[in-house]
């Protein structure tokens, strides 16, 4: 697939989309070549910029996604200008999707490469990748930005071997009035102790995640990956810092580098600038040492794509034979225009670009592990389900469940005194109202009186939540109509 890029080098370097390009339909400016997978909030495609011939990546985000988070991601990418951070070229509104045009990194993520080759990385390879990653983090931290989701899946390599930070879906901006953040954001196994404890954190939270990523590149998965993520969340702050499973396999310099990243006290943890001076990083070799593993991974990927294409072609032939025998294979697409017909097929629409397999970790965590030799494999990008909702980490679902329980407990506190103190009072579960049969008419009337103000409060909360999601979309559409590029 990459030979297209080599045979047709860009006529000139694309730096940013101009005003004229941004007012056109995206299909007039780009040719979409193939789907790469799923990123945070949307599908990612490989495309070619018609004017320059340059390959780009386009993230297509449905507007029902959290647009505020998407705008934040765009804003952070737009402010960055570093060879170690994925570049942002511009964005479009197309029907119900937001198209974000970004730099394309042909070798994929580090975790993709590990998985495709079914091999972990050597110390030399890790040192070279860490050096570029630290330069990217040094730049971000100088700009007062925290990435908050550093892991091998978010470190991309171009075909020359240069590493770049990507996926700013949860990145944050530090301001003078908010020196530390208190929100739990990130992927559980890579999260710093202070992030989990919600005691406030700053840029060095990324350094902890980098130390975990170093272990991930060396061993194929992060520490605690074999246990339930909720257990890991409680173990990370309480246990000593993790280390290698087999320390004897690694040099003293490498182990010391990881040790300096994984200091539990953020005040004593090394910064990106300091770690760039560490002997392990200073002795890193040039990016040329990564070319062999990149070529090997790309060869594996190409062979798999060819095998998938053969399967698709074979299925097409079978479907064609069936069409000759049975015209009933042509069906109308429900909800489409009356004149639209669609070929019924057993193949998924995305079968030629994605492979599904069972991971040893829950898929919603977005983590990546080395597959067993007999497993089929997939990229770090996850296939989105039919609801097109972004995957939610299980630890966030846990906290949301706790919040729901707190809301249920507060239900009883708002009930009038006589009923609240009644021994018969109980919190209702959805669909379970059998206990009401044993109540007196007086108790039922009191309960009815208590429900009305509670319902009004819930409706108001829902209305505010709806408005908070609706307004940014309206603002963005209005801004686009005025041809003001605010991204």
From Swiss-Prot:
Phosphotyrosine is found on: 433
Modification type Phosphoserine: residues = 265, 320, 410, 414
Q: Where does ATP bind?
A: 36-44, 59
What GO terms fall under cellular component here?
cytoplasm; nucleus
The Protein kinase domain is annotated at: 30-281
Catalysis performed (reactions): L-seryl-[protein] + ATP = O-phospho-L-seryl-[protein] + ADP + H(+); L-threonyl-[protein] + ATP = O-phospho-L-threonyl-[protein] + ADP + H(+)
Among CDD domains, the record links this protein to: SARAH_MST1, STKc_MST1_2
Keyword annotations for this protein, in alphabetical order, are: Acetylation, Apoptosis, ATP-binding, Coiled coil, Cytoplasm, Kinase, Magnesium, Metal-binding, Nucleotide-binding, Nucleus, Phosphoprotein, Serine/threonine-protein kinase, Transferase
In this UniProt entry, the residues modified to Phosphothreonine are 3, 183, 340, 367, 387
Q: Where is this site: Cleavage?
A: 326-327, 349-350
Q: How is it modified after translation?
A: Autophosphorylated on serine and threonine residues. Phosphorylation at Thr-387 by PKB/AKT1, leads to inhibition of its: kinase activity, nuclear translocation and autophosphorylation at Thr-183. It also diminishes its cleavage by caspases and its ability to phosphorylate FOXO3.
Region named Disordered: 305-338
N-acetylmethionine modification sites?
1
User: Could you describe the subunit structure of this protein?
Assistant: Homodimer; mediated via the coiled-coil region. Interacts with NORE1, which inhibits autoactivation. Interacts with and stabilizes SAV1. Interacts with RASSF1. Interacts with FOXO3. Interacts with RASSF2 (via SARAH domain). Interacts with AR, PKB/AKT1, TNNI3 and SIRT1. Interacts with DLG5 (via PDZ domain 3). Interacts with MARK3 and SCRIB in the presence of DLG5.
**Functional description taken from the UniProt entry:** Stress-activated, pro-apoptotic kinase which, following caspase-cleavage, enters the nucleus and induces chromatin condensation followed by internucleosomal DNA fragmentation. Key component of the Hippo signaling pathway which plays a pivotal role in organ size control and tumor suppression by restricting proliferation and promoting apoptosis.
Listed name of the protein:
Serine/threonine-protein kinase 4
Q: Which organism is it from?
A: Lemur catta (Ring-tailed lemur)
- Tell me the classification of the organism that encodes this protein: Eukaryota, Metazoa, Chordata, Craniata, Vertebrata
